[in-house]
């Protein structure tokens, strides 16, 4: 099964999407889903003494402006594993530039976790948590000599727009 092409983007898009975990929370290993091999591969180990602040992965059947599937971060208390599918509620969007390309990231919470039942928008997340996530993406590639830039957070409505946009880009490229 191709976890990118064979799974719907979610059960109730854009309000609820599937996140296919590539990198568990707390990991320094950067795994990527290799679309052609249909397997997870170790892309690299982070050069810095930092770790992923949330579950990190992709939304199936999406394509974003950087030519890759739409990235998604899912806030969790405990890490899962590569390949885990999390039914997720988008709550925000981190605007970001990576290597000159727009590389925004959806921030979401797991539908099945009662700790996040009342979280509907990034305004429901402590400001410091958002700063930690943005700081990770501002610094995690510095020792590789690569530049990333975060441009700020937007709320759930912008996240929904980004999800719909990425589904449309995928549809135009692969389904027409």
Swiss-Prot record:
Binding positions for Mg(2+) 1 per the UniProt entry: 66, 71, 103
Record localization: Cytoplasm
Domain of life: Archaea
Coiled-coil stretches: none
Protein name per Swiss-Prot or TrEMBL: Inorganic pyrophosphatase
Annotated Mg(2+) 2 binding sites: 71
HAMAP family listed in its UniProt record: Inorganic_PPase
Catalysed reactions, as listed in the record: diphosphate + H2O = 2 phosphate + H(+)
Main subcellular location: cytoplasm
A GO-annotated cellular component: cytoplasm
Gene: ppa
Cofactors required: Mg(2+)
InterPro entries per UniProt: Pyrophosphatase, Pyrophosphatase_sf
Subunit structure: Homohexamer.
Residues the record lists as binding substrate: 30, 44, 56, 140
Entry's transmembrane regions: none
Family to which the UniProt record says this protein belongs: Belongs to the PPase family.
Organism field: Methanothermobacter thermautotrophicus (strain ATCC 29096 / DSM 1053 / JCM 10044 / NBRC 100330 / Delta H) (Methanobacterium thermoautotrophicum)
Assigned EC number: 3.6.1.1
Pfam families, per the entry: Pyrophosphatase
Alphabetical keyword list: Cytoplasm, Hydrolase, Magnesium, Metal-binding
MF-aspect GO terms: inorganic diphosphate phosphatase activity; magnesium ion binding
Source taxonomy: Archaea, Methanobacteriati, Methanobacteriota, Methanomada group, Methanobacteria
GO aspect biological process, one term: phosphate-containing compound metabolic process
Purpose: Catalyzes the hydrolysis of inorganic pyrophosphate (PPi) forming two phosphate ions.
């Amino acid at each position: 099964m191709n976890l990118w092409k064979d799974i719907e983007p979610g059960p109730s898009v854009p309000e609820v999407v599937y996140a296919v975990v590539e990198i568990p929370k707390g990991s320094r290993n950067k795994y990527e889903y290799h679309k052609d091999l249909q397997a997870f591969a170790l892309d690299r180990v982070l050069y810095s003494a930092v770790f992923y602040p949330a579950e990190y992965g992709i939304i199936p059947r999406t394509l974003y402006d950087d030519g890759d599937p739409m990235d998604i971060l899912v806030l969790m208390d405990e890490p899962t594993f590569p390949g885990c599918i999390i039914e997720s509620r988008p709550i925000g969007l981190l605007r970001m530039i990576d290597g000159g390309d727009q590389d925004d990231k959806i921030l979401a919470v797991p539908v099945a976790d009662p700790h996040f039942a009342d979280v509907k928008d990034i305004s429901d997340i402590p400001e410091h948590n958002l700063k930690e996530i943005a700081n990770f993406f501002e610094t995690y590639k510095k020792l590789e000599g690569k530049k990333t830039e975060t441009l700020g957070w937007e709320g759930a409505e912008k996240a929904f727009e980004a999800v719909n946009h990425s589904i449309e880009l995928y549809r135009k490229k692969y389904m027409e």
